[in-house]
């Protein structure tokens, strides 16, 4: 292992364990009807009770009438800005600070990310981002960092495609923080990342936004739950911070089932080029965005596996339409619409060489399959029959499949994971969610020759 002198470090101090982290401070301005007040502003990442970016304003000289009427809702703050950038949103709380002779407000932006540093013309050579609640992975390479007299292993994963390179890096505190997350839940910084052009040339804010948006869905698909790059900072050739984009982690800690085995990080390195090639296509970007969104919600088992069954099959049908109709033109839109749901699944899975048989890892489904029971022809038939019993109140089998809901939920998600991997041209190994397995135990995807 080589000693790592890498410049890649967090751009903000998330290590203190505080529930509110200062990201930026500057000049603030608010408008109460026709009156404009100037003061100081701060942008913070608040982690409790739920992670959010909030803006805080501290204003002197606010008239008593405006302060009172705003506090009781008779007047509204019509605009709030920091450094001349108006931030659309709404006031959460307000009130006087008698000791400081100030009127303070807390403002929630309408959407994230929030940007007041840099603009569309800003050029940068690298972007540093932060990952909260990612997985405890073994890197594709390893370095060391010193902490006091001790040397610690640092894990790195390198992703590359189409002239871009992305590095994911663990921290000295990663393993300890993941243990705390497993015990306490919540939000903790576990990894940082860096985006650069392979030739070290500059790129624009739009380039950075596009790459970060793709990484949001790629990394979330790898984890099996929302895990997006947040609080990105762009640096120019001199190392100056020229662009900042602040956002919050979407979900608190969860450790869902997923195809990605964290001890085999080469899996995501291998998938990345094919995924981003699909992502670069407008139609496929929209399809993957929808499908992965449904996948992530379906995979959150505590929200209900019956709902997860329905969401998963909506995602499979969407994937089948994009692949079978729009890309391969195997049939028309009308022809696709006229198919049974099970045939839409068969069309996709057969085309991608994903097996149709009900697997032995779902013994309760296998028990119900024979002709003297449900007479299910294959897994698509079983999955769609169970889904139909949930969504159609008049279904003759409604309420009769409770003992196989978990297997149907898990099998449907396995098919969805395999479909996404195959469509992205992946032919490596994966962790099979259908099997009880150790971390590090993987197998080849079914279509690998």
Locate each region found by the language model.
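Charged, non-catalytic interaction/linker regions at domain boundaries
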Residues: 2-293, 300-303, 403-446
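Alpha-helical repeat scaffolds in large eukaryotic proteins
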Residues: 216-220, 317-320, 324, 395
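Short, solvent-exposed secondary-structure capping/transition elements
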Residues: 224-228, 321-329, 399, 429
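A glycine-rich, aromatic-flanked flexible loop/lid motif
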Residues: 283-288, 352-355, 380, 385-388
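Solvent-exposed, amphipathic alpha-helical segments
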Residues: 290-298, 386-393
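Long, well-ordered mid-to-C-terminal structural blocks that present hydrophobic/aromatic surfaces
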Residues: 291-359
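Charge-enriched, short contiguous segments at helix-coil
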Residues: 309, 369-435
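Conserved mid-sequence domains
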Residues: 358-373
């Amino acid at each position: 292992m080589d000693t790592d002198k890498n410049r890649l470090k967090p751009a903000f101090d998330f290590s203190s364990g505080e529930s509110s982290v200062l990201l930026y401070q500057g000049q603030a301005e608010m408008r109460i009807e026709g009156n404009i007040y100037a003061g100081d502003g701060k942008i913070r990442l608040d982690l409790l009770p739920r992670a959010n970016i909030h803006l805080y304003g501290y204003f002197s000289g606010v008239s008593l009438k405006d302060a009172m009427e705003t506090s009781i809702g008779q007047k509204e703050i019509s605009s709030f800005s920091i450094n001349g950038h108006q931030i659309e949103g709404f006031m959460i709380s307000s009130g006087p600070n008698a000791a400081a002779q100030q009127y303070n407000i807390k403002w929630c932006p309408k959407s994230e990310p929030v940007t007041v540093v840099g603009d569309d013309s800003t050029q940068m050579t690298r972007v540093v981002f932060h990952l909260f609640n990612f997985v405890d992975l073994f890197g594709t390479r390893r370095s060391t960092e010193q902490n006091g007299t001790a040397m610690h292993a640092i894990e790195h994963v390198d992703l590359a495609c189409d002239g871009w390179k992305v590095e994911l890096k663990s921290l000295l505190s990663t393993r300890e923080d993941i243990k705390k997350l497993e015990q306490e839940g919540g939000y903790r910084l576990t990894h940082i990342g860096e985006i650069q052009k392979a030739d070290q040339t500059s790129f624009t804010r739009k380039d950075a936004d596009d790459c970060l948006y793709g990484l949001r869905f790629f990394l979330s698909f790898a984890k099996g739950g929302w895990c997006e790059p947040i609080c990105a900072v762009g640096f120019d050739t001199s190392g100056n911070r020229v662009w900042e984009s602040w956002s919050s982690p979407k979900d608190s800690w969860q450790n869902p089932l997923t195809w990605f085995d964290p001890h085999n990080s080469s899996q995501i390195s291998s998938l990345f080029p094919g995924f981003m090639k699909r992502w670069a296509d407008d139609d496929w970007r929209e399809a993957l965005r929808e499908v992965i969104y449904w996948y992530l919600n379906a995979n959150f088992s505590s929200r209900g596996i019956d709902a997860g069954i329905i969401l998963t099959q909506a995602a499979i049908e969407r994937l089948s339409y994009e692949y079978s109709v729009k890309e391969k033109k195997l049939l028309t839109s009308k022809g696709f619409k006229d198919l049974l749901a099970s045939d839409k699944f068969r069309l996709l899975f057969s085309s991608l060489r994903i097996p149709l048989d009900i697997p032995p890892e779902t013994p309760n489904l296998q028990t119900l399959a024979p002709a003297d029971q449900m007479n299910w022809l294959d897994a698509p038939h079983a999955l769609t029959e169970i889904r139909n019993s949930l969504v159609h109140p008049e279904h003759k089998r409604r309420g009769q499949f409770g003992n196989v809901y978990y297997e149907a939920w898990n099998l449907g998600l396995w098919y969805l994971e395999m479909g996404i991997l195959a469509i992205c041209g992946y032919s490596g190994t994966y962790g099979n969610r259908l099997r009880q397995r150790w971390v590090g135990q993987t197998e080849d995807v079914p279509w690998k020759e």
